[in-house]
């Protein structure tokens, strides 16, 4: 890895350390969130958004690095990219494709859409980690990122639930998500089929993490700064 890549990764890790346990109701010496003995811990909406944006950006960077590593090691010359277009399990969720489309959507709808996308990745991320562990000579650069993304996706989902609870208190959101049925493909005996299944899943993860990152930045600007940013 070149110096620029090492520096970027170091910066991202530092940001993550700064917001470790960022959505947990704990009192931290440098950032006292809850008074001693508090029962219902509340983090400010601005802090929640700040931390969610940092975390979503971290997840997107990890997913991009993991996809690029897999592409370099396993996908060269196989023509996978032409088959991967519009074949994500989350395609059933109607998500805006760019910032202009997202700006036309009410923030309540966009918040719930983020929740649905994050929930749609719980199952595939769990199985991704399991199946990568089972790969012969699985590269640590891929496995370590898969493990980290699975953990941070759960943390981001928890944070988003807190954000929705503050923006729309009292509203119970149905746990709607897009079901993933790609496990058999990750376990196929045919190498080309199996590698494409991994490639496609990582391609979709990179795509969706980028969307969530953009949606959160837009929502933070709209809700926290009244679109004045």
Swiss-Prot record:
* InterPro entries, sorted: 4_helix_cytokine-like_core, Somatotropin/Prolactin, Somatotropin_CS
- Gene Ontology terms describing biological process: cell surface receptor signaling pathway; cellular response to hypoxia; female pregnancy; lactation; mammary gland development; negative regulation of estrogen biosynthetic process; negative regulation of hydrogen peroxide biosynthetic process; negative regulation of nitric oxide biosynthetic process
The answer to whether UniProt assigns keyword Signal to this entry is yes
Per UniProt, the keywords (alphabetical) are: Disulfide bond, Glycoprotein, Hormone, Lactation, Phosphoprotein, Secreted, Signal
What does the subunit section of this Swiss-Prot or TrEMBL entry state? Interacts with PRLR.
Checking CDD domains in the record gives:
prolactin_like
Any GO MF annotation of the entry:
prolactin receptor binding
Query: Which SUPFAM superfamilies does the entry link to?
Result: 4-helical cytokines
Disulfide pairs here are 34-41, 88-204, 221-229
State what protein this is by name.
Answer: Prolactin
Positions bearing carbohydrate: 61
Which is a Gene Ontology cellular component entry for this protein?
extracellular space
Q: What does this protein do?
A: Prolactin acts primarily on the mammary gland by promoting lactation.
Q: Which family does it belong to?
A: Belongs to the somatotropin/prolactin family.
Please list the residues that carry the modification Phosphoserine: 56, 64, 120
The cellular location(s) given in this protein's UniProt record come to: Secreted
Check the record and name the PANTHER family matching this protein.
PROLACTIN (PTHR11417:SF5), SOMATOTROPIN,PROLACTIN (PTHR11417)
Q: Where is the signal peptide?
A: 1-30
């Amino acid at each position: 890895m070149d110096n620029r890549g090492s520096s970027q990764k170091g910066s991202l890790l530092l940001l993550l350390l700064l917001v470790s346990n960022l959505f947990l109701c704990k009192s931290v010496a440098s950032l006292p969130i809850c008074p001693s003995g508090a029962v219902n811990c509340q983090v400010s909406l601005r802090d929640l958004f700040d931390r969610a944006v940092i975390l979503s950006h971290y997840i997107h960077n990890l997913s991009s690095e993991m996809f690029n590593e897999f592409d370099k090691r396993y996908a060269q010359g196989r023509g996978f990219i032409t088959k991967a277009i519009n074949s994500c399990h989350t395609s059933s969720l109607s998500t805006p494709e760019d910032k202009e489309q997202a700006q036309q959507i009410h923030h309540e709808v966009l918040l719930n859409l983020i929740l649905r996308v994050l929930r749609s990745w719980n199952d595939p991320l769990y199985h991704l980690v399991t199946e990568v562990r089972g790969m012969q000579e699985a590269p640590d650069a891929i496995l370590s990122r898969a493990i980290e993304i699975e953990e941070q996706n759960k943390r981001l989902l928890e944070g988003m639930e807190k954000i929705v609870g503050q923006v729309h208190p009292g509203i119970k959101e149905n746990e709607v998500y897009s079901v993933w049925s790609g496990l058999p493909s990750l376990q196929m005996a045919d190498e080309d089929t199996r590698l494409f299944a991994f490639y496609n899943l990582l391609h979709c993860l990179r795509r969706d993490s980028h969307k969530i990152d953009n949606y959160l930045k837009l929502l933070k600007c709209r809700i926290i700064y009244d679109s004045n940013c």
